[in-house]
A protein has these predicted regions:
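Hydrophilic extracytoplasmic domains
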Residues: 96, 103-144
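Extracytoplasmic beta-rich repeat domains
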Residues: 1-2, 9, 20-40, 64-87, ...
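Conserved beta-propeller blade signature
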Residues: 4-7, 43-45, 53, 91-94, ...
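Generic detector of contiguous secondary-structure segments
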Residues: 38-58
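Surface-exposed loop/turn positions within WD40 beta-propeller blades
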Residues: 2, 11, 49, 98, ...
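Loop/turn-rich, solvent-exposed surfaces of beta-rich toroidal or solenoidal domains
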Residues: 46, 53, 61, 66-67, ...
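WD40 beta-propeller blade core
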Residues: 15, 53, 102, 141-142
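Short loop/turn segments that connect beta-strands within beta-propeller blades
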Residues: 18-21, 56-59, 105-109, 144
Length: 144
């Protein structure tokens, strides 16, 4: 946002750091290895365990936590990791290490769809001109 940077240090800590002074604005206990997305006053990130965190950017207050892996059996969840996510049309699109994409409603956190789109070699999703793209098996695939 020009004033702060937001990141996880992969040690269950998610930070907001003041760009000018380098001081910590706030810290939360979130284990995430993927890049967060900032929209207006909200920060979105997905933990290694598949939880979508929605936080207020200035104070770091957690507004909502949604379990995006809830439809997987415990045995599968244990080895499942998020690859990355994109946000568009009020939905969150999350790709996973098993080749699935999960579509979640951004307002409620509910899961709208889960679909197998490839094997375990898929990229995080990208949105361009209102279309969703994923790199899958070395090819760029467009979804409507």
């Amino acid at each position: 946002d020009g004033n702060s940077i937001y990141f996880s240090n992969n040690k269950n800590e998610f930070y907001s750091i003041d760009v000018k002074t380098g001081t910590t604005n706030w810290r939360n206990e979130i284990n995430s290895t993927i890049t967060p997305i900032l929209i207006k006053n909200l920060i979105f990130t997905v933990s290694e365990e598949g939880y979508l965190y929605v936080m207020e950017k200035n104070e770091g207050n957690v507004i909502r936590i949604s379990n995006l892996f809830m439809n997987y059996k415990k045995k599968i969840r244990k080895n499942l990791k998020p690859i990355g996510f994109a946000i568009g049309n009020l939905n969150l699109y999350l790709t996973n290490s098993n080749g699935d994409i999960i579509v979640s409603d951004l307002n409620s956190g509910s899961i709208l769809n889960k679909k197998k789109i490839g094997n375990n070699l898929i990229s995080r999703p990208f949105i361009y001109n209102n279309s969703l793209f994923v790199v899958r098996n070395g090819s760029i695939v467009k979804y409507n």
